[in-house]
């Protein structure tokens, strides 16, 4: 009886270990393909971002697309909050204009990504692709706005680059799914 119980515990632990290995493989395998296909995605960033969500450990490729899109929404909201804090301080009027533009662009991006998530879930990957492209473009437009006036430096460059990577991950996944 003692041996049977020990064997059950052993096999249970083995199954847990195998599940962890399999889930790591889908995240790593997907990130490898995504990083190869998209110049906007760093492999390590992809693995760290997707791997941070506990659902990624049991997700399929479609699920990873939804996870990456949700991560983009979360990061976009953080950017809007960060910009809001900057706007509450005394800032140059030109900088303020570009920051306000970014707030609007990230609101548009959030809407696009929410629609893309619905498209992922309904397996309309072509539509998800279009909407993730729009969200990525909104972030690039935000960053490019600061370059319009000499002497203005974007205070959100790193945040924008991370957002571009998150949306590029989702975008690449739509292509892997056949968009």
From Swiss-Prot:
Role of this protein: Invertase inhibitor.
Known tissue expression: Expressed in pollen (at protein level). Expressed in stem, but not leaves (at protein level). Expressed in pollen.
GO biological process, one term: pollen germination
Entry keyword Secreted: yes
Subunit relationships: Monomer.
Post-translation changes: Not glycosylated.
Disulfide bond positions: 31-46, 102-142
Transmembrane segments: none
Keyword Endoplasmic reticulum listed: yes
Lineage, opening ranks: Eukaryota, Viridiplantae, Streptophyta, Embryophyta, Tracheophyta
A GO term, aspect molecular function: enzyme inhibitor activity
Gene3D superfamilies: Invertase/pectin methylesterase inhibitor family protein (1.20.140.40)
Organism expressing this protein natively: Platanus acerifolia (London plane tree)
Name assigned to this protein: Putative invertase inhibitor
GO cellular component, one term: pollen wall
Pfam families: PMEI
Assigned keywords, A-Z: Allergen, Cell wall, Disulfide bond, Endoplasmic reticulum, Secreted, Signal
Subcellular localization, as worded in the UniProt entry: Secreted; Secreted, Cell wall; Endoplasmic reticulum
Signal sequence region: 1-23
């Amino acid at each position: 009886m003692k041996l049977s119980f020990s064997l059950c515990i052993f096999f249970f632990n083995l199954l847990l270990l195998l599940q962890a290995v399999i889930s790591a493989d889908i995240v790593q395998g997907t990130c490898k393909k995504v990083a190869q296909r998209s110049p906007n995605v760093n492999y390590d960033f992809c693995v760290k971002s997707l791997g941070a969500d506990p659902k990624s450990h049991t997700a399929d490729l479609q699920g990873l697309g939804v996870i990456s899109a949700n991560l983009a929404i979360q990061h976009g909201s953080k950017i809007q909050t960060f910009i809001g804090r900057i706007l509450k301080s005394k800032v140059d009027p030109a900088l303020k204009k570009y920051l306000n533009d970014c707030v609007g662009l990230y609101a548009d991006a959030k809407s696009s990504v929410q629609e893309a998530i619905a498209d992922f879930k309904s397996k309309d990957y072509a539509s998800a692709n279009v909407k993730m492209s729009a969200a990525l473009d909104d972030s690039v437009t935000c960053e490019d706005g600061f370059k319009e006036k000499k002497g203005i430096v974007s205070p959100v460059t790193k945040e924008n680059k991370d957002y571009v990577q998150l949306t590029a991950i989702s975008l690449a996944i739509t292509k892997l799914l056949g968009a």
